[in-house]
């Protein structure tokens, strides 16, 4: 398993090692060991808006996940906007760092097959798993 973190923004310090550690823990738990790669692009609102155009949207989002299949050499790409995360973190009572990792986990779950747009049941399951990882890997560890 290889996790590539590409930081294309200068708005916030990014801890690439911690991003890789969290990604590896989630992926190991969800899919086990494998000979695959995952790319995580850290960017700003302007850049993520360009990616969103492929989805027919002209506004930024906090995260986009492009899943290519778990049997592929590159299982997916995750794009995260630090600007969007910075704006929304206070709304959820999170620090920037907490919100960043919460959104990272969200993107990872999409890569391994979770979806919250198909049904309320799927959404409930995905957000429960996301919250579990967040409290296991981020929130509870800070105390």
From Swiss-Prot:
Its EC number is 3.1.-.-. It is an enzyme of class 3 (hydrolase). One of its GO terms (cellular component) is cytoplasm. Keywords: Cytoplasm, Endonuclease, Hydrolase, Metal-binding, Nuclease, Ribosome biogenesis, rRNA processing, Zinc. It is found in: Cytoplasm. Pfam families: YbeY. Its cofactor is Zn(2+). Binds 1 zinc ion. Single strand-specific metallo-endoribonuclease involved in late-stage 70S ribosome quality control and in maturation of the 3' terminus of the 16S rRNA. PANTHER family: ENDORIBONUCLEASE YBEY, CHLOROPLASTIC. This is Endoribonuclease YbeY.
